[in-house]
Amino acid sequence: MIFQSFLLGNLVSLCMKIINSVVVVGLYYGFLTTFSIGPSYLFLLRALVMEEGTEKKVSATTGFITGQLMMFISIYYAPLHLALGRPHTITVLALPYLLFHFFWNNHKHFFDYGSTTRNSMRNLSIQCVFLNNLIFQLFNHFILPSSMLARLVNIYLFRCNSKILFVTSGFVGWLIGHILFMKWLGLVLVWIRQNHSIRSNKYIRSNKYLVLELRNSMARIFSILLFITCVYYLGRIPSPILTKKLKEASKTEERVESEEERDVEIETASEMKGTKQEQEGSTEEDPYPSPSLFSEERWDPDKIDETEEIRVNGKDKIKDKFHSHLTETGYNNINTSNSPIYDYEDSYLNNNNTGNTEIFKLQLLDKKNENKDLFWFQQPLVSLLFDYNRWNRPFRYIKNNRFEQAIRTEMSQYFFNTCKSDGKQRISFTYPPSLSTFWKMIKRRIPLLSLQKTLPNELDNQWISTNKEKSNNLNKEFLNRLEVLDKESFSLDILETRTRLCNDDTKKEYVPKMYDPLLNGPYRGTIKKKFSPSIINNTSLENLKERVRINRIHTIFLPNTDYQELEQKVDTVAKKPLSTEIDEFLTLINEFGNEPKSSLNLKDLSLFSDQEQGRVNSEKRTKFVKFVFNAIAPNGTTSEKKSIGIKEISKKIPRWSHKLITELEQQSGDYQEGVPLDHQIRSRKAKRVVIFTANNQNNDPDTKDTDTADQDQTKEVALIRYSQQPDFRRGIIKGSMRAQRRKTVIWKLFQANVHSPLFLDRITPPFLFSFDISGLIKPIFRNWSGKEGEFKILESREEQTKREEKKEKDKKGENKRKEKARIEIAEAWDTIPFAQIIRGYMLITQSILRKYIVLPSLIIAKNLGRMLVLQLPEWSEDLQEWNREMHIKCTYNGVQLSETEFPKNWLKDGIQIKILFPFCLKPWHISKLYSSRGELMKKKKQKDDFCFLTVWGMEAELPFGSPRKRPSFFEPIFKELEKKIGKFKKKYFITLKVFKGKIKLFRRISKETKKWLIKSSLFIKKMKKELSKVNPIVLFRLKEIDESNETKKEKDSLMSNQIINESFSQIESGNWPNSSLIESKMKDLTDRTSTIKNQIERITKEKKKVTPEIDISPNKTNNIKKFESPKKIFQILKRRNTRLIWKFHYFLKLFIQRLYIDLFLSIINIPRINTQLFLESTNKLIDKYISNNEINQEKINNQKKIHFISTIKKSLYNISKKNSHIFFDLSYLSQAYVFYKLSQPQVINLSKLRSVLQYNRTSFFLKTKIKDYFRTLGIFHSELKHKKLQSYRINQWKNWLRRHYQYDLSQIRWSRLMPQKWRNRVNQGCMAQNRNLNKWNSYEKDQLIHYKKENDSELYSLANQKDNFQKCYRYDLLAYKSINYEKKNDSFISRLPFQVNKNLEISSNSNTSKHNLFDMLGNLHINNYLRKGNILYIERNLDRKYFDWKIIHFSLRQKEDIEAWVKIDTNSNPNTKIGINNYQIIDKIDKKGFFYLTIHQNPENNQKNSKKAFFDWMGMNEKILNRPILNLEFWFFPEFVPLYNVYKIKPWIIPSKLLLLNLNTNENVSQNKNINKNQKQNFFLRSNKKIKNRIQEAKEPASQGEKERGSDIENKGNLGPVLSKHQNALKKDYAESDTKKGKKKKQYKSNTEAELDLFLKRYLLFQLRWNDALNQRMIENIKVYCLLLRLINPSKIAISSIQRREMSLDIMLIQKNLTLTELMKKGILIIEPIRLSVKNNGQFIMYQTIGISLVHKSKHQTNQRYPEQRYVDKKNFDEFILQPQTQRINTDKNHFDLLVPENILWSRRRRELRIRSLFNSLNWNGIDRNSVFCNENNVKNWSQFLDERKPLYKEKNELIKLKFFLWPNYRLEDLACMNRYWFDTNNGSRFSILRIHMYPQLKIN
């Protein structure tokens, strides 16, 4: 057995070794490459298919294999790879070759094609076949399925150690695959040739010569296929001649580009080197696998040459390299033998000869412009033909405001090299290429022996020791901090703060976060900082001058320098010789640009400001450059001696040298300076429609010509109209190839829209594939339930609404179809060339024809006609109407201009002609007597008061609409005639009728008498016969019986028929879905019954006529018994039976019908009725169950409101048992209740709920029905697990709630939420007076002990750190809870840190009282755990006193109200009573700051006296009402804008109390003054550097600002001066700031406009929100206004358009200063503040979900009632104390529960501590890296931080497993650290999958 298992084990391991061996993998990957089929196979197939002898086949195969072998070798051998993989060589060689080959195939006599001689080697065609196959194999193109397969070998080569072995085995694998393929192909061909069925095919036999033809034309077929592939690839190759060359951004930038190339030269060259496989690797990233004939490399082509040279031929080539590069950029005029260029390398290495290079650079620059045009032909051919800067690939042009040009994305970001990492030599894939090149150069210079080689162990040990030292230091520091904590000497200094880069020591200003390297790491941009001249004061100017001058010169010399480099190079240029010229230099700059650039603005690379740069022509520039150089030239000797300085090695980001603009930007003129005037990016087809031009004369003599041109432009009001056709351009750049674009596949012959194949499934499938199953099933069910009687009543209403909806839908659909048709027509006119011109002229001719020819002639004809018919002519009326008709020229969109004015470019853009009051010819005009009826008609036709003229002279409702019907001229005439004829006919017909009737009667009488005579004669004959046979008495008796029975039967049948008809008519009356079917059935039935009736009637009539004299009543039938005999009875029965049998069929049918109706339907309806009743009853039960006596009014209210998470209904009755026990199982009660409540309102706002309710834990529901109901509503998903219900504690639940700040809306969002009446009703409920409220003053003082008397330093640092800490803590807790949620009852963290206010509450007694099966909840208020500010918006609980904010109405219009509103600082009168509700105002509001007013829980709230609100769910007695941030009246103080801005930028630094400082204008002015003295700086100043638009106040010194503030405060609430001051500031501000670059500054006419602009620009998001109808009306109004503005006398049209309701005055209220409040009240304008996390600040990412970033220190007070729970003693983190149930909790010591001890450290240091201590370096040698996660022995213990001796838990001594989320504390860098590479990725996409618990479990003994 052992032996067997041993053998088996060996076998397995052997197999694994074989499978993993290089050879096997190589074979596998090689085999896979066979499947990448390219055009090279075409030649091979050709040789096989065309029977040209074996020699050709052999040569083809060998050529094919040789080509592939070369490709494989090229992977490993670099020179060959460079030769084959170079784009230009292949393109240049391939195209001519392909074309040559194609033509050669078509000319048979070119060589002796086809005929083989004996000496076959001399025959050229065989060599050609070989060459074809060889060369085609080298072209790296493919057809099926993807080039990826061909590249697999290259990719896998990275992982292999023995590369040659892998390459050879790969080739062998390919060979095997190829041989198999060839064999299979041969078999197929043989089978085709030999297959009898193919040969005996009828079609082939009938066309005998078809096969021969095919065989003969095989060569042609192949050449056609080849040509197609060639053309296909030609489309994808950047052809050197045809593509459009983009203009460089500007001449300076060209210069820069060349400089940059020179600077980056070495680096990019070496970048190409990498490892040999690197080029192939880069193709992986290529969005198009192999887009051209060869694998087009994605970098600078010339640099590939250089790499080659460096790699292969070493040092000698370098000098040529530099030279060749210079020639390329146009420096080839220098005589190389004499120039110092050969010293360049030496100077680079040895720092000598720098001066020469320096001067040499200058010379080059100077001469470059002259020589550029002269020597262009001397540039290398490659770079002339294939400019790598050309935008050949259809990349998107992604603009970047921070950088000058767009970054080139196609550069590989990987460069592989070995480096020291973790004490070992490892391969790094982001190694700086310049370093490796530099190292190689050093190696060549210095002999290898002198370079010390460090042993690997040395490295390792050194690294380990330094690491140990660092980790020890960290641990020490950490422990020290913890010890300080233990000693109870708590101060915030224990918490480590983040180091920030300081900008200005005096003002304590930090660098903005975006630019702070200590926060964000090295940032890829440089700061663009612009100082306006007024801000820079004298001292700073002095400091700047020297630096700026030198830097400016530097920007000319070394264009692409960085700020850091500059610091090192300040001394390189001699300062003295420059000083004389420099002032002229600066003045010159100032002439060109208004603003001097700051020292940081080096990347601008221009000597001129943004506005002017485009305008300064090249002559000025060259003069200027010469001036600068001449100024320096005499002193050149001094600069020679200086060293060039050490260059910092950094990777230059490759950029495009173009700045491109879109078509749209070109039209609107929004582009910046230095950009070509012509657009390069093709925008969507659009037309600029000018709707209004104001021709204001420019009277200002000072303005220059350029300005006037600008002004004229701005006077045009234009709309941009996009054509409705699909956008095939999609921002493509001119000259790039459309064929290569991704995601724009066109697969149809005519395709309306561009589709990405990704969304194929979304496209509506063709008709064949769509099966409407439900549509098929419905009618079947309808038929089945077709005969229901009662059900119809239930469904009728629903059906009716459905039908109505369907009608509406159809109508909408019809409108949409019409709209679509109109658009299509419009687009057709737009797209066809010259169509607009033709259409325009046609319209104008039609207009003239209509107005002046057709209509007048019609009027004349009509009136002449009237005269002929002897009626009065109506000349005046007709002419009046004709005059009223107006033809107005409109733009193509239908914007009205005027009668005379044509739209701009109307021939090109198109025109519409709108006819107002179109003339309609009427046969007569209605007199005034009939006007009342006419008015109604008019009202109906008011809409038809205008129309658009079509090309054929018809009238259309809308442009390009279908022509409408005109009321016919003859129709009323005909109607009148018809009426008269009708009257005449009536009289005539009446007489005719009477006459006819009489004739009929006469004829009938004659007929009847005739019949009667015949019948009576026959009857008499019969009677005679009968009488002779039978006794006469019997005869009469029998007749009697017979007659009576028959009549009875007839009556019966009549009755039943009637009933049936009635019942069916009832059924018919209902709204049946399948009525047509039922109708048809019923018709059949009624037809049958009626026929029976008729028959019966006819029989009876006949009988009556025959025997009129015998009239025997049926009553006498009883006498028959006397005369009965069996024989007679039998006869009667027989007769009856025959009749019954005859009618049985109908009876049976009727019976079944009745049975169905009575029985079957009732059976069907029983369950329906039952379920309905059941549901209703359950609803009622639940209603009763949950709220026994609810106010009905509340229900009504609930339906009106949009509800928040739970609308907890208030109940106003007392419960006898007051002392409730709060400790109970929440899962049973609260959520069920919440869900029930959610089902109540008509409108459910689910968007916020879903996230809360969807969690896969215990199901909330006692009844599955409720659950199903919510599932259908879509509130949660169905996978709720039915686990064991968990027990929650109230405080845990509250703590959970407290952390979900989504639901805790900031107070600004709420203003007057509900109608006042309703609020009053709630507030007027009985309110128990609370005695304890008087203790508030003392309490406030206690609470504010830690607020540390408001002085600046404390205020900022304390608030900042504390809030930050709380934020962190909350993240931790969230993380902890979400991981350890199973052990809720054991969780030992349940409180927030920093319980500043000692706001204690008494634990409730544990006497429990049950009510209605539900545990009662204590009266705990949510205000203690919601943000304090939000108390304003909670509906008041009835037994508390609050300050009711809603009483004070706040309106912008009444400034006095603002004053009163602010005056609520009640130091003067602490017990002010406001309003009827006697709310007591809380004092010291100013201390807290207006935004965070706290309302405290009652300290000694006696629960026995407080009224229990029934079902106070989780203590949430106050209802929270959800509203969006709509009524933001605060922000409409101009006062608040800068403040808000400051707060936005530094939310941690400025406590919000500062925001209202200026508005606290109350009696205690002195106190406020004191506060202000403490805060010496004007906070406007503080915000200045952050706010882009500088507020004018900042320009004044701080002292002046303070004086102003003092005076403001003394105004005692009169905010006028404050506001006006600010408005002045705004005015100044807007006069200074330029709103658009390169444009004239914008002047504001009014303050409102300026304010509006300020709001809408930066601080607020605004939306114009209206419904479609309003939108439509708005547009209509605008169109009318456009017309009215042009008319000289607009009143007439205005009035008529108002009458026609074209123009609605309510919408377009023209006011001089439109008040925003009005718009907001109407709900049209919605303004919301931009959230604090708007832009690029990673720290605020979580803000959207949890608003911790806004938390102020006064906001959180923890609810400290923890019944029956043990409490953490702060002294010892791990000790629990059992509290007596009624004892007050001791929270006097201000400690906090540390969830994670390391939170003391800052995040970066925390990370370091973790990584150093947890990933123990010593254990890495023998262990797999990931074992850290599972091997607990490796994990350092945390017992040093947590006291081991004491048990952590109450009864259990469990392990605490502290797991950490990846997100909250430690960002993604940790993950990158794990792998010991800092990933160089542009975005975090690679990380998105890693949702892991990163840190190992923390083990505590």
UniProtKB/Swiss-Prot annotation:
A cellular component annotation (GO) from this entry: chloroplast inner membrane
Biased composition (Acidic residues): 256-268
Topological relation to the membrane, as annotated: Multi-pass membrane protein
TM helices/strands, residue ranges: 18-38, 64-84, 87-107, 124-144, 172-192, 221-241
GO BP term (any one): protein transport
More about this protein: There is a partial copy of the N-terminus (positions 1-349) of ycf1 in the inverted repeat (BAE46710).
Subunit structure comment from the entry: Part of the Tic complex.
Protein name: Protein TIC 214
Region (Disordered) location: 248-299, 797-817, 1591-1618
Family that this chain belongs to: Belongs to the TIC214 family.
Gene: TIC214
InterPro entries per UniProt: TIC214
Pfam families: Ycf1 (PF05758)
Keyword list, A-Z: Chloroplast, Membrane, Plastid, Plastid inner membrane, Protein transport, Transmembrane, Transmembrane helix, Transport
Protein role: Involved in protein precursor import into chloroplasts. May be part of an intermediate translocation complex acting as a protein-conducting channel at the inner envelope.
UniProt lineage: Eukaryota, Viridiplantae, Streptophyta, Embryophyta, Tracheophyta
Compositional bias ranges of the Basic and acidic residues kind: 1591-1611
Subcellular location: Plastid, Chloroplast inner membrane
Domain of life: Eukaryota
